[in-house]
C-alpha cells in the first residue's frame, strides 16, 4: 500500500467515491456535536477530513490530535453536505470520511499560529521552518520554482547551455566588498566568493560556448536594504554574435514568457528610454512609470532670479533646479499641511536642505493667485514662466528641488514616487495600477568619484563603449556612452547587462581611463587580457535578479519573503545563528589570528 496516493489540496470531486491516502499536517481540529473535523494541509492546500464516532479507534486518535501533528489519513471521498462547501478551496466541494488515521509524528505546541498575519520578522526568521509551512510562503516558493523552470525551458529552447563557474575565485576589489575565504594550503592567501560570474562567462564566450546560462548564487558584503541580501540568486546569461538590440529583444521575450507561463501575467512590450531622458524627466535611472508625474526643468530660468536658493543652485557647477507639479495637491481636499510638512522632512533623507512649494489658487491672477513663502522672492516674469512651463492649473501644488544635480534627482525623484503611491496620489489618478516595464539604455560609461578624485565605471569595467566613443575615454570620459542596458519593472531594477569589450586594446584603454596601471591590470585581470587576444568574439549578456523577479510577481514587501532561508538586514541567519565564532584550532589551520578589539568604555 502506498504511503500517499494524492496531495490534500488536489482531492476534488473527480475522485468522488474513491478511497484515498493522504499525508500532511493538522491545520485545525474542530469537534462538532460528536463528529470531529480535521483540516489537513500539505503544499497543495487543505482537505477536510471527517472522523465519525462509529469508528472508535480512529475517533480516539482524532480526539488527541493538535495543530501541526504530522498524520496519515485513509478514507472515502464524498460530497460535502449542502451549504457547507467552500469555493475558496480546490477541495471545497468534497470531504474525506476517515477510515484509518495514523499519527506519523506529534508536534510540540508551535510558538505561533500559522494563520497569524501580525508576526514580527524576527519571530518568523527564528522559526523559519514553521514559517515556511504557511500557505503564503508555500505559494511563494512554488512560484519561485515555476519561474526557474520556465526560465530553463526558454533558454534550452534557444540553444543555451548551463555551465557552472567557480565559487572560489580571485578577489578584485573594484566593486562592492568581497566575501573572503582563507586558504589553508596557501598561507596568507584568500579566495573570494563571486559577486558575479562576469569574467568566467566572458571566458566561456572566448572558448566558443556561444550561449551560456546559469542560475547562480552571488555574494556581496554590502549594507543591506529591503531588496538586498549578502547572498542572492541571479539568472546569469551570456551570448556571442548578437547585437545589443537583439540581446534586449531575446531577453525581453524570455521575461514576458516567464511571467505568462509561471504567473499568468501578460506584460506589455517594453518601451526604451535613454538614461539621459530618465534622469531629466524622473530623476531616476529606474523610473516607476506607473506614477504620472514628471519633472519640469527650470535650471536656466532660475539663473537670473534674485532668490539665492534657486539662483545659487542654478549657477553652481553641476547644479539643478526642477519643479514637480502635483495636480490637485493644492486644492480643497488635496495635500494637508501635515502631509506637506512630512514631505519637507522626507526629502532631507536624500540630502535636500528643504522643500520649497507654491500652491496655485488662481493661475490667471499672477502673483496674487499664488500661495507660498517663496513667492515674494521671485519676480512676476519668473513666476509667470514657472506657471507656463509646468502647465500649472488652479488647485495644483508645485514642489521645487534646487541643489547639486544628484541631490535634486534623488530627493525629488523619491518624492515623485512617494506622492504617486500615497492615498492622495491613488485617489487623484496620479498612479496607474498596471505592469510598467522599461529598458533604460545609453548609460554613461564613467562617473567621477569625488572621494577618490578619479573616474569609475558606472556598470563594470568590461562594458563596451558605443561605436565612435572609444576616443572619448581619453579626451572627454564624461561624454562616453556605454552599450549598457537595464531592465526595469514598476520602478525596480530587475536586471542589467551590456555588450562587453572583446578587443584587448580597448579593454586596456578602459583600465587606463580608470587609472588602473598596466602592471595592476595584468596582476588582477591578466587572464582576461590574454584571452581577448585569441580571437574573442563580440559578446554580451544580462543578469536578472531571481529574488527581485519573484518578489515583484508575488507582491512581497521584501525579497526575504521569497527566499527559503534568508539573512536579516544585519546579515544574520536567525535560524542557525550564523555567523558564529569558530574554534581556535580552525583559525590556526587557516593562519588567522583575531585582533582583540577594545570595547568602548
From Swiss-Prot:
Gene Ontology annotations of biological process type: aspartyl-tRNA aminoacylation
Catalysed transformations (reactions): tRNA(Asx) + L-aspartate + ATP = L-aspartyl-tRNA(Asx) + AMP + diphosphate
Binding site for ATP: 220-222, 229, 493, 545-548
Site (Important for tRNA non-discrimination): 32, 83
Region (Aspartate): 198-201
Residues reported in the UniProt entry to bind L-aspartate: 174, 220, 459, 500
Record family assignment: Belongs to the class-II aminoacyl-tRNA synthetase family. Type 1 subfamily.
UniProt cross-references to HAMAP family, sorted A to Z: Asp_tRNA_synth_type1
Job description of the protein: Aspartyl-tRNA synthetase with relaxed tRNA specificity since it is able to aspartylate not only its cognate tRNA(Asp) but also tRNA(Asn). Reaction proceeds in two steps: L-aspartate is first activated by ATP to form Asp-AMP and then transferred to the acceptor end of tRNA(Asp/Asn).
Listed name of the protein: Aspartate--tRNA(Asp/Asn) ligase
Amino acid at each position: 500500500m502506498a504511503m500517499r496516493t494524492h496531495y490534500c489540496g488536489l482531492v476534488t470531486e473527480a475522485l468522488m467515491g474513491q478511497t484515498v491516502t493522504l499525508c500532511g499536517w493538522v491545520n485545525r481540529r474542530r469537534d462538532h456535536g460528536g463528529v470531529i473535523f480535521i483540516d489537513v494541509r500539505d503544499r497543495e492546500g487543505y482537505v477536510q477530513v471527517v472522523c465519525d464516532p462509529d469508528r472508535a479507534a480512529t475517533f480516539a486518535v482524532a480526539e488527541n490530535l493538535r495543530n501541526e501533528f504530522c498524520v496519515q489519513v485513509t478514507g472515502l471521498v464524498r460530497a460535502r453536505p449542502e451549504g457547507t462547501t467552500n469555493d475558496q478551496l480546490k477541495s471545497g466541494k468534497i470531504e474525506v470520511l476517515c477510515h484509518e488515521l495514523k499519527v506519523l509524528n506529534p508536534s510540540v505546541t508551535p510558538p505561533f499560529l500559522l494563520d497569524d498575519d501580525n508576526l514580527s520578522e524576527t519571530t518568523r526568521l527564528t522559526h523559519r521552518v514553521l514559517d515556511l509551512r504557511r500557505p503564503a510562503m508555500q505559494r511563494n516558493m512554488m512560484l519561485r520554482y515555476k519561474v526557474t523552470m520556465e526560465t530553463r525551458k526558454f533558454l534550452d529552447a534557444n540553444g543555451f547551455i548551463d555551465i557552472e563557474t567557480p565559487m572560489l575565485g580571485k578577489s578584485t576589489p573594484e566593486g562592492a566588498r568581497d566575501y573572503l575565504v582563507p586558504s589553508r594550503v596557501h598561507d596568507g592567501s584568500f579566495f573570494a566568493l563571486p559577486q558575479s560570474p562576469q569574467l568566467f562567462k566572458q571566458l566561456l564566450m572566448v572558448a566558443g560556448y556561444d550561449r551560456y546560462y546559469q542560475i547562480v548564487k552571488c555574494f556581496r558584503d554590502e549594507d543591506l536594504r529591503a531588496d538586498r541580501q549578502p547572498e542572492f540568486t541571479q539568472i546569469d546569461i551570456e551570448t556571442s554574435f548578437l547585437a545589443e538590440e537583439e540581446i534586449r529583444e531575446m531577453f525581453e521575450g524570455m521575461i514576458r514568457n516567464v511571467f505568462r507561463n509561471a504567473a499568468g501575467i501578460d506584460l506589455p512590450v517594453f518601451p526604451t528610454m535613454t538614461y539621459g531622458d530618465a534622469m531629466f524627466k524622473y530623476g531616476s535611472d529606474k523610473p516607476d512609470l506607473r506614477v504620472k508625474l514628471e519633472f519640469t526643468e527650470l535650471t536656466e530660468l532660475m539663473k537670473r532670479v534674485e532668490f539665492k536658493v534657486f539662483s545659487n543652485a542654478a549657477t553652481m557647477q553641476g547644479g539643478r533646479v526642477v519643479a514637480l507639479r502635483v495636480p490637485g495637491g493644492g486644492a480643497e481636499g488635496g495635500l494637508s499641511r501635515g502631509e506637506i510638512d512630512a514631505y519637507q522632512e522626507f526629502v532631507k533623507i536624500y540630502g535636500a536642505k528643504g522643500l520649497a512649494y507654491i500652491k496655485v489658487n488662481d493661475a490667471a491672477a499672477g502673483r496674487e493667485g499664488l500661495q507660498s513663502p517663496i513667492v515674494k522672492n521671485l519676480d512676476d516674469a519668473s513666476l509667470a514662466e514657472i506657471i507656463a512651463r509646468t502647465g500649472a492649473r488652479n488647485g495644483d501644488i508645485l514642489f521645487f528641488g534646487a541643489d547639486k544635480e544628484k541631490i535634486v534627482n534623488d530627493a525629488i525623484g523619491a518624492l515623485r514616487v512617494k506622492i504617486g503611491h500615497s492615498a492622495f496620489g491613488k485617489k487623484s489618478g496620479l498612479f496607474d495600477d498596471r505592469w510598467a516595464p522599461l529598458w533604460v539604455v545609453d548609460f554613461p560609461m564613467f562617473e567621477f568619484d569625488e572621494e577618490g578624485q578619479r573616474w569609475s565605471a558606472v556598470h563594470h569595467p568590461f562594458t563596451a563603449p558605443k561605436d565612435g566613443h572609444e576616443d572619448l575615454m581619453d579626451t572627454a570620459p564624461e561624454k562616453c556612452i556605454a552599450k549598457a542596458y537595464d531592465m526595469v519593472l514598476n520602478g525596480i531594477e530587475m536586471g542589467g547587462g551590456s555588450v562587453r569589450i572583446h578587443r584587448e586594446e580597448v579593454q586596456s584603454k578602459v583600465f587606463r581611463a580608470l587609472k588602473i596601471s598596466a602592471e595592476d591590470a595584468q596582476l588582477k585581470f591578466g587572464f582576461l587580457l590574454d584571452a581577448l587576444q585569441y580571437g574573442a568574439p563580440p559578446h554580451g549578456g544580462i543578469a536578472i535578479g531571481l529574488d527581485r523577479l519573484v518578489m515583484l510577481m508575488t507582491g512581497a514587501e521584501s525579497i526575504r519573503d521569497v527566499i527559503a532561508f534568508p539573512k536579516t538586514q544585519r546579515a544574520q541567519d536567525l535560524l542557525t545563528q550564523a555567523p558564529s565564532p569558530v574554534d581556535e584550532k580552525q583559525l590556526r589551520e587557516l593562519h588567522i589570528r583575531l585582533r582583540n578589539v577594545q570595547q568602548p568604555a
